[in-house]
């Protein structure tokens, strides 16, 4: 691994924590300042006393080792580290690849036996960033209310024909799964009880979450079913992106980090207190050589073992730039990396060295979410009741224009008028994620209801479709929240991380209730996929071919000219009209064919006319070409 070699590190320092063969199992735990380490072997994943305890021996670089003879498959293990005269408590270690129920004990399994049929020929799909269209989904939300689901709320739901057909019909090319590693907040022993969590509370970073498996008591099941899910999606041409949360752990004192290497993996402030840049009680120290190497090995493990196509990095702004660049270097080029270019609080590390959105220009091949585009379309994150462009409020054009070009430098974007960022922060347009809503904050329907008092269903649909037109015609990487294609709401809940299924589940009945919404999303995605002008992928090409038109308030208009990106259409005009009245936009006189108009999409053409003025109906988008 070039990135690790450059730092003088050992490629398998963490990844080789447990090595199983039928003849014996080798254990190797990093515990650099330990006085002693005991290895406990258990017959079960929970309860009972150890069937064997082995005193591990200290080797080089603070790695403690032990070898236990015989076939241990099906057994469980923990480590117990002694440091400064104190036993730190049992832990499955730092890099468990399989665990018992609730992740308290590591499990010894034959990883090769978890590979589903055809796994050896499965690969990450290798899509270019320009071909990625992201669908963000929570494992439980997506399937728990689907009547014909055989495995509601489980990894295997995404192998079922109805699920695959929905995603393929919509046209998305990648599914982004909210945290699916082993997290702490759901009790896997009592899944009969109502429980819900998004999963941003890491326990074991390198094991799939047990509550999404059909049997969390059998360690190999969650591993195999995650792989089955990945393979089914790959077979359908859908890439798999995992949401990863390395910026904090569920807590400090009971974490696997703290029970092996106290205070090594966490930052402290000048007062010696644990820093909380995550807003969750702690923040990890990615700049520390051990945490840096841990992250690199963990990313690479998921990419290699589970054939993942990409990663969404939670609170990426907590991590340092150097570590993010090393992760980028360690992974294949077409494994997508994007993240939140901010933190949730002040970090105990210089801000100029953090992977913030403003520093994305220093991280080639890594993207960040554009809150400029999001908030200029729907309103600020800080106030759910404030509206913006969708309510035809003035002053938001430049921010939307920045989002349209992918937050790159463009001669027609005045960044002094852009919200949050006063200069371009992306070198290439594919370093910007274009979106209007995600799992965080109000979903788009709820935001429209909160920010535009008295809004009716027809107007809500018009504005919903208008907002997504900006997203899917952006030169950035388009990103949508699952269920928005069926007009999803969350009953106005702003932060639904522990809300019940009644709030978070997808409203599948809406597919029949609002078929025009799905058809429009489907059409926009098909338009983007069919026409390279909307995904040029190069800042130089965007500056050459994308030209904004002079228009009044409540409007954004641009032209993709001269067969941009080799497109079959010579010039494409996109007009977004948030006003409550129709507007006219001047264009060169020519014969134009409309493909998006008045809430409908037809790539073969809706209407053709020769004109020098485009009439754009109220609260809608118009796309024409010549």
PLM ranges: what are they?
Residues 3-22, 58-136, 141-152:
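The feature marks proteins involved in alpha-glucan
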Residues 23-27:
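Structural beta-strand segments of beta-rich domains
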Residues 31, 73-77, 606-626:
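C-terminal beta-strand-rich structural cap/linker in extracellular carbohydrate-active enzymes
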Residues 31-36, 579-580, 589-591:
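Short proline/glycine-enriched turn/loop motifs at strand-loop junctions of beta-rich domains
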Residues 100-102, 106-109, 113, 328-487, ...:
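Conserved alpha/beta catalytic core and glycan-binding cleft of carbohydrate-active enzymes
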Residues 138-306, 316-332, 336-339, 347-348, ...:
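Substrate-binding/active-site clefts of carbohydrate-active enzymes
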Residues 416-421, 476-493, 503-572:
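Glycan-recognition and catalytic regions of carbohydrate-active enzymes
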Residues 460, 473, 506, 524-526, ...:
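C-terminal accessory region downstream of the catalytic core in glycan-modifying enzymes
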């Amino acid at each position: 691994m070039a990135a690790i070699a450059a730092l003088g590190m050992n490629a398998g320092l963490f990844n080789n924590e447990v090595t199983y063969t039928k003849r014996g199992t080798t254990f190797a735990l990093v515990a650099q300042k330990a006085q002693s380490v005991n290895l406990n072997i258990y017959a079960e994943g929970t309860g009972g006393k150890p069937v064997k305890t082995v005193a591990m021996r200290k080797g080089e670089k603070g790695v403690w080792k032990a070898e236990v003879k015989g076939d241990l498959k099906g057994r469980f293990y923990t480590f117990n580290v002694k440091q400064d005269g104190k036993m730190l408590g049992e832990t499955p270690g730092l890099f468990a690849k399989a665990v018992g129920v609730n992740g308290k004990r590591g499990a010894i399994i034959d990883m090769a036996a978890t590979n589903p049929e055809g796994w050896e020929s499965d690969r990450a799909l290798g899509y270019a960033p320009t071909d990625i269209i992201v669908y963000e989904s929570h494992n439980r939300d997506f399937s728990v209310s689907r009547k014909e689901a055989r495995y509601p709320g489980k990894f295997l739901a995404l192998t079922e024909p109805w699920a695959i057909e929905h995603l393929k019909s919509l046209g998305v090319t990648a599914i982004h799964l909210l945290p699916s590693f082993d997290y702490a907040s759901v009790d896997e022993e009592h899944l009969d009880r109502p429980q819900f969590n998004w999963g941003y509370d890491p326990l074991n970073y390198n094991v799939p979450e047990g509550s999404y498996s059909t049997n969390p008591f059998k360690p190999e099941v969650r591993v195999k079913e995650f792989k089955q899910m990945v393979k089914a999606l790959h077979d359908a041409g859908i890439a798999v992106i995992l949401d990863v949360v390395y910026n904090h752990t569920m807590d400090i004192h009971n974490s696997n980090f703290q029970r092996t290497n106290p205070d090594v993996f966490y930052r402290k402030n000048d007062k010696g207190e644990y820093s909380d840049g995550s807003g969750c009680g702690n923040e990890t120290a990615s700049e520390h050589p051990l945490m840096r190497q841990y992250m690199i090995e963990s990313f690479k493990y998921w990419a290699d073992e589970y054939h993942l196509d990409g990663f969404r990095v939670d609170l990426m702004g907590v991590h340092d730039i150097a570590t993010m660049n090393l992760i980028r270097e360690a992974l294949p080029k077409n494994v997508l990396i994007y993240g939140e270019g901010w933190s949730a609080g002040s970090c105990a590390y210089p801000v100029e060295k953090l992977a913030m959105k403003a520093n994305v220009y220093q991280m080639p091949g890594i993207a960040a979410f554009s809150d400029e585009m999001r908030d200029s379309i729907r309103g600020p994150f800080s106030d759910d009741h404030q509206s913006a462009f969708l309510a035809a409020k003035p002053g938001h054009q430049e921010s939307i224009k920045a989002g349209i070009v992918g937050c790159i430098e463009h001669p027609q974007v005045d960044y002094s008028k852009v919200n949050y960022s006063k200069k371009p922060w992306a070198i290439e347009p594919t370093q910007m994620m274009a979106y209007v809503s995600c799992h965080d904050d109000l979903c788009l329907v709820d935001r429209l209801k909160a920010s535009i008092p008295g809004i009716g269903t027809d107007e809500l649909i018009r504005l919903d479709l208008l907002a997504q037109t900006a997203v899917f015609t952006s030169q950035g990487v388009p990103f949508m929240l699952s269920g928005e294609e069926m007009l999803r709401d969350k009953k106005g809940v702003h932060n639904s991380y522990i809300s019940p299924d009644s709030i978070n589940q997808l409203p599948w009945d809406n597919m029949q209730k609002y078929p025009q919404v799905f058809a429009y999303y489907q059409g926009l995605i098909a338009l983007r996929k069919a026409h390279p002008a909307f995904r040029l992928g190069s800042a130089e090409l965007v500056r050459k071919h994308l030209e904004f038109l002079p228009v009044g308030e409540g409007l954004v208009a641009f032209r993709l000219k001269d067969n941009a990106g080799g497109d079959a259409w010579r010039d494409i005009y996109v007009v977004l009209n948030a006003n409550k009245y129709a507007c006219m936009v001047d264009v060169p006189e020519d014969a134009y064919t409309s493909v998006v108009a008045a809430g409908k999409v037809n790539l073969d053409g809706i209407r053709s006319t020769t004109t020098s003025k485009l009439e754009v109906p109220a609260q809608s988008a118009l796309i024409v070409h010549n």
